[in-house]
Structures are given as structure tokens and as C-alpha cells.
């Protein structure tokens, strides 16, 4: 494997004897740092997404509309922004912890995924998990947070069998139950 300490790898040998790119075509920048993401404001009346505190992982996304979400119901809410992510990255839309704890507001498909080639408005599918109280969202409210992460864009290779492990095919609640052998 050819790797530099700054992740500027171009070729990785693969068991099949062929070679493939370690990162998708078009990724040439230093992958240790992403200084900025191109953002298009579709609603200039809303604040720019930004971190509440310097070390926060996510930036706050704001609602473009007023909406009332009935208990147990969901609404697709626009954020008024579109972004251009570099190949090899993903945007993850997470609930805001305070809204989840105080109001029962969450995201249906948490975390939501913004793929690198998507250029449309980021929308959030919000759900009211409170059993009895509607949630009122006002235009401009912070409704979710966006986190940018690197992803491995791998190829899948079909095989006849997988290597053996202690866990094997035990899943969904099997951890801590002891051996099935």
C-alpha cells in the first residue's frame, strides 16, 4: 500500500491483482483538512449555518417555514441551503439534543444523509415523538445540525464464504449472552 503521512495516496494493490484508486476520481486535495464547503443560500433571510461554539462538530440548520407537527406526525422542512461536498465526504443531519430532550422533536431517518453529488436544498424529515403535545416550529428556528465527515468509497467483492470469527452470525441482542457453541 502506498500511503503518505498526509493521506495523498493514489494507488492501492487489491488481492485480485488489479489496481484501483484509493480515493474517488477527482479527489486530489489533502484529505486531512477540509477548510471550507461551498454553500448556496436559497433563502437569504435565514442565518448562515454555523457552530454555536468553536469546538462543535455540527453547524445549526434553520427552518424556512412555520409549521406545527402533531403528536406522532412528521413534516419535511426546508433549510434554505444547498451545499457542494467534495467527493469522499458526506453530510450527516442529526437531531438537536435540546429539542429532542425538551420537545420530543427528532429526525425520522437520523442521521439523514447528504451525498457528495447532491446539489438540491437540504431538507429535514422531522418527527414529533411526544405522545400528546404538538410542536410549533417558527421560521428561523434551529431544527437540526449538519456534520461533515469523510467516508470510504469502497468496492464490494463477492466471495463464496466469509472468514470465521468468535461472534459469527450472532447479532441483534446476542452480545453478553455467552457462547452458543
From Swiss-Prot:
This is Deoxyuridine 5'-triphosphate nucleotidohydrolase. Pathway: Pyrimidine metabolism; dUMP biosynthesis; dUMP from dCTP (dUTP route): step 2/2. It catalyses: dUTP + H2O = dUMP + diphosphate + H(+). Substrate binds at residues 96-98, 109, 113-115, 123. One of its GO terms (biological process) is dUMP biosynthetic process. Its EC number is 3.6.1.23. Its cofactor is Mg(2+). InterPro entries: dUTPase, dUTPase-like, dUTPase-like_sf, dUTPase_trimeric. Belongs to the dUTPase family. Keywords: Hydrolase, Magnesium, Metal-binding, Nucleotide metabolism. Pfam families: dUTPase (PF00692). It comes from Corynebacterium efficiens (strain DSM 44549 / YS-314 / AJ 12310 / JCM 11189 / NBRC 100395). Gene3D superfamilies: 2.70.40.10.
Amino acid at each position: 500500500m502506498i500511503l503518505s503521512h498526509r493521506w495523498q495516496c493514489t494507488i492501492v494493490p487489491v488481492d485480485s491483482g488489479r489496481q484501483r484508486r484509493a480515493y474517488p476520481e477527482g479527489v486530489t486535495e489533502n484529505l486531512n483538512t477540509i477548510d471550507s464547503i461551498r454553500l448556496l443560500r436559497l433563502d437569504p433571510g435565514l442565518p448562515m449555518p454555523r457552530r454555536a461554539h468553536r469546538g462543535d462538530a455540527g453547524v445549526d440548520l434553520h427552518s424556512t417555514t412555520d409549521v406545527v407537527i402533531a403528536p406522532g406526525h412528521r413534516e419535511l422542512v426546508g433549510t434554505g441551503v444547498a451545499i457542494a461536498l467534495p467527493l469522499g465526504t458526506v453530510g450527516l443531519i442529526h437531531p438537536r439534543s435540546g429539542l429532542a430532550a425538551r420537545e420530543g422533536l427528532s429526525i425520522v431517518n437520523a442521521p439523514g444523509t447528504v451525498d457528495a453529488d447532491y446539489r438540491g436544498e437540504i431538507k429535514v424529515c422531522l418527527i414529533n415523538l411526544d405522545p400528546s403535545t404538538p410542536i410549533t416550529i417558527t421560521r428561523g428556528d434551529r431544527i437540526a445540525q449538519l456534520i461533515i465527515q469523510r467516508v470510504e468509497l469502497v468496492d464490494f467483492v463477492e466471495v463464496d464464504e466469509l472468514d470465521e470469527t468468535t461472534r459469527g452470525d450472532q447479532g441483534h441482542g446476542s452480545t453478553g449472552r455467552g457462547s452458543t457453541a
